[in-house]
């Protein structure tokens, strides 16, 4: 369910096209260039394609897609012979996403201290103009710039090491699909529903079949509610969406609407100082901001 071509940002559009061909049932992990410098200007220019590149390359990125995400920066690790090598962001994130899925589900964000830790690289950084790897911690100021262009930062956090601190997809417009956990949930659902629907091919196109397939879909979605993927859902498979004309064309329609669970990305904890006795007396007003 993951697609990547580590080290080749120019292959991103090809991967997106392939995912489109297979019905957007996977998630594309894209790379930023090795030589992309950790400055606000450089990152903003690349993410916004200020140079007006016509293809994805070192000067800019042109591809937008809900099922695509970019990460920054690259990493430093050792190969099988013990040599120190530079690896692209996807090298780190493929491992991180797989590890996240192993302890949770695809609809849990592969980011943050619980599931976003990078364990297959020793530092993060970029390759300078002399071909030398330079480490960078990707501080909050750069993380804010990266968020503005929907690129997910791999930061060095004190006491925690390398951690992915973002889960933006490369969606062109703001929607639930501009977050990776929701995108991967939808891709997962598409795969499961494709499998679920196949046994109903060539069954009688009648009320019983409609009832059976609706029950099967309800069961899958109800399980996802229990697994913290969905807040709610609705499934319609009756004569309202299976009209006589559709039945005469040998079609069976199942319409589904879902409310995906969103991830916490910002935490606000304001601290108020009160006079002695204010809490005991109840004279502290509302604590809600």
Give, region by region, the residue ranges found by the protein language model.
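Structured, hydrophobic secondary-structure cores that serve as assembly/anchoring elements
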Residues: 1-289
